[in-house]
Amino acid sequence: MGPEVKLYKKLKEFTPQIIWNRIENLSLPGMPDLLGYNTSGTFFTVELKVTKSNKIKFSPHQIAWHVQHPKNSFILAEALGPRSRNRFQMFRGSCIMELSGRGLELEACCLGLEACCLELESLGA
């Protein structure tokens, strides 16, 4: 099981009230990993990233997708390793260009898995 699948399982476990659909789409490059639907009736996407450094790698297609879809799109990053201060960080899709350049030095909209989950649950409320 890959690291992003493990991250998905953690996210799903912490958010039983969100309906999750994993998107495995080879015909639309750059499409985020997850489509979520919360109890407020709000759809949103989440790109999952796991990194052992402060850098997050994105394909040009992923960057383009988030630039074209800046609202209700998120990037959830899990930092692995002994120097990881904030293991789980979430960023708005509209910040992807800055996130691609600065990595985890960029200020996240949420820190910690619980806070990230609460943010997604409250969208549209």
Locations of regions flagged by a protein language model:
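Acidic-basic catalytic patches of nuclease active cores, encompassing PD-(D/E)XK
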Residues: 1-25, 39
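Conserved catalytic cores of phosphodiester-cleaving nucleases, focusing on short active-site segments
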Residues: 34-36, 42-52
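Long, intrinsically disordered low-complexity tandem-repeat segments
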Residues: 108-118
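Mg2+/Mn2+-dependent nuclease catalytic core
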Residues: 51-70
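Beta-rich catalytic cores
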Residues: 30
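Intrinsic disorder/low-complexity segments
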Residues: 122-124
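Short, electropositive alpha-helical surface patch
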Residues: 97-107
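Nucleic-acid nuclease catalytic cores
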Residues: 68-97
